[in-house]
Amino acid sequence: LPLNTGLASATDNCDPAPVVTYSDATVAGECPQEYSITRTWTATDACGNSSTCSQSVIVEDTTVPTITSCPPDVTVECDESTDPMNTGLASATDNCDPAPVVTYSDATVGGQCPQEYTITRTWTATDACGNGTNCIQIITVDDSTPPTITDCPADVTIECDETTDPGNTGLASATDNCDTAPVVTYSDLTLEGGCPQEYTITRTWLATDACGNSSTCSQIITVDDSTPPTITTCAANITIECDESTDPSNTGLSSATDNCDPAPVVTYSDATVAG
């Protein structure tokens, strides 16, 4: 309006108050908010005599939009989405464009492990004339959740001649929210039992993901010796003279084997009946 862009004034040799009017011719610019006006001012006296002058009014958009809401920095778990719907959206206003366009671009830097990284998200608000401004949001992706041991082997009792290898006593398995293949290991603590062939193993299973988060479970393996030895050679019945020795070295020895004890002890006792 002329109140903002300037008013024309005129004088006349006879008319003390010539009428001043204007008309505008508008030419569009390179964007919707820019254009130029050729304003023609006309001064007319009471007798219809007139004169004109021209004014050029150039309308520009050089003001960048204002980002009214830049999402705050945020930390999310590695199994969460980094989509703006989860991490936050930016919004903007502009002095001329009613709907400035808001976009973003990401620059990702790896962390200490494969599942951890940092995103520098640059939000940019641009109006229809290409004026732009930006703000920065930092998105930190962490892996702080330990694996879940989905199958911890049950406590088990085995014979002393059986293997305590997990292939026999049971294997643990695990899943993780981010690592597709958490590592499962175990360690054993052995407590001796009442005899050399009997003992108890406390087996601690450990599931660890690529970021070092871990969880454990325990399995008790009881090793028993409940199988008696086998007498492999029993001394045969025998008849001897009364002046011969009844010692086993003369009458025969028995021998035995055992599933666990390499040297079972063989003893004997006698019951005598008079002839």
Question: What residue ranges belong to the model's regions?
Answer:
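Proline-threonine-serine-rich low-complexity tracts
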Residues: 1-275
